[in-house]
Structures are given as C-alpha cells and as structure tokens.
C-alpha cells in the first residue's frame, strides 16, 4: 500500500525516527503530538489548556496538509500527565469537535519531556 508522508510547512525535526503524519488509502495517521515549538521546546509550560490548543492546532495542520479537516477525525489517543488537567483539556478539545465526536481513549502517563502535559495521536478518514 503506497503512503504519502505528511509534513506541514514550518514543522520541526522530530525527536525520534517518525514523521508528523502519513496518508494511506484515504486515512491520515497523525503521530503523537506534543506542544513543541520548531526546536522541540515545550511551549505554554504549566498551562494544560494552552498546550491542548497548540497540540490540536498542530494536528489540524497535518490533516489539512493531507487534504482533510477536523470533521474527518475518527479516533484520538490522549495521554496526559495529571488527571487534574482533565477538565481543562476537555474544554479545549470540545471546541475542536463541536459536532459528532470522534472515538478516543485517555491515559495518564509520563511524557518524553517533563514540562509536556498532553500528547494526542489521531486517525482521520478523508474524502469520505
């Protein structure tokens, strides 16, 4: 199955051997996304809502670069470092998915950088 690598303009180099997203058979797979700037520094330190917005804007950029939109998202994997941030994360999340919500799960865990509060990986079906 052929795949297309999706790298939006202005994307920094990943910390590990992966790409921001891939497109295969009309499905966009967005890698785990954190609130990083182009130099892989965490932005909005201590602010879960702002980090969530940054993460979702980055995911939106990957999906739009592939030719889709946020309405095409069918599944999200959410990783957060502290359940105390759950309400703030959900408030921002709901802004990006105002209609039919995608399936998802949410796990509390440690992340690759100590100041990162949230990571989201996404699957979107475009061209439906």
From Swiss-Prot:
Broad class of enzyme this protein falls into: hydrolase
Molecular-function annotations in GO: deaminase activity
Residue runs in coiled coils: none
EC number: 3.5.-.-
Alphabetized SUPFAM superfamilies for the sequence: YjgF-like
InterPro entries named among the record's database cross-references: RutC, RutC-like_sf, YjgF/YER057c/UK114
Database matches in Pfam families: Ribonuc_L-PSP
Keywords for this protein: Hydrolase
Catalyzed reaction equations: (Z)-3-aminoacrylate + H2O + H(+) = 3-oxopropanoate + NH4(+)
A single cellular component GO annotation: cytosol
Record-level GO BP terms: nitrogen utilization; uracil catabolic process
Annotated family: Belongs to the RutC family.
Role according to the record: Involved in pyrimidine catabolism. Catalyzes the deamination of 3-aminoacrylate to malonic semialdehyde, a reaction that can also occur spontaneously. RutC may facilitate the reaction and modulate the metabolic fitness, rather than catalyzing essential functions.
Protein name: 3-aminoacrylate deaminase RutC
Organism, scientific name: Serratia proteamaculans (strain 568)
Gene: rutC
């Amino acid at each position: 199955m052929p795949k297309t690598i999706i790298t939006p303009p202005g994307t920094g180099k990943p910390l590990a051997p992966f790409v921001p997203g891939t497109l295969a058979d009309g499905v966009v797979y967005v890698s785990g996304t954190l609130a990083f700037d182009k130099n892989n520094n965490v932005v909005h330190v201590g602010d879960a809502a702002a980090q969530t917005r940054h993460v979702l804007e980055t995911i939106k950029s990957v999906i739009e670069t592939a030719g889709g939109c946020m309405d095409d998202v069918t599944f999200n994997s959410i990783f957060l470092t502290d359940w105390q941030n759950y309400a703030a994360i959900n408030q921002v999340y709901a802004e990006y998915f105002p209609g039919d919500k995608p399936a998802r799960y949410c796990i509390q865990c440690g992340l690759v950088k100590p100041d990162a509060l949230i990571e989201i990986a996404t699957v979107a079906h475009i061209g439906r």
